[in-house]
């Protein structure tokens, strides 16, 4: 594994552990909402244990869902902001160290961090995407709860539906963290390359594993000028990176993720056709 690939790999590994904290935030919100909805259903049941849709009931449910997800949105944003700032700093510092830059870029880096974290993709920045995901989940759960009540489902069936909805959204949140982190780490490394005075080109490096997409696989091993380099991430959960090319450097080894071993350098296409 190239030193610059390892920087991203190490950051990804550290973040994978932190994502467990994000899952706990989802579990906390899920359990709170389950308790609130159970209390609302119990309060609105008639003597026969039946519950019917009414305006006060829908208001109570909507109010509980809105409050839960407002708090969850704030928690998720704080978590993601911390992950992205740490990811940028680590990628910037380690990349600068590997290239041999020793200047104090503290003031410049603050400007770089703010720009990198808030940069939009397709017109939306990370806070927009967090809000969109949380809002979609809130609406889906609200509608699913009402559908369960309309169809006469028991409270345990309603609870299962809420848990299922949270499970899907937790995966989407983890994917968003990985995708945004890939973007910020790439921004940090490109900031170092562009300001180094020694890096003029980069090499696209994909991952040697069977689920690497054709787009990334086709670009693997290709050289690009700094100002014509592909944007990373190429897609959600992208694990590619850009390696600096200095003087006559050529890669000699790389990691084979399918076997967890180091091999003599070959491109993804060559690896796939072996």
Where are these regions (language model features)?
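Acidic, glycine-rich two-metal-ion catalytic cores of nucleic acid-processing enzymes
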Residues: 164-260
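N-terminal leader/targeting and assembly helices and adjacent pre-domain segments
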Residues: 1-161, 248-274
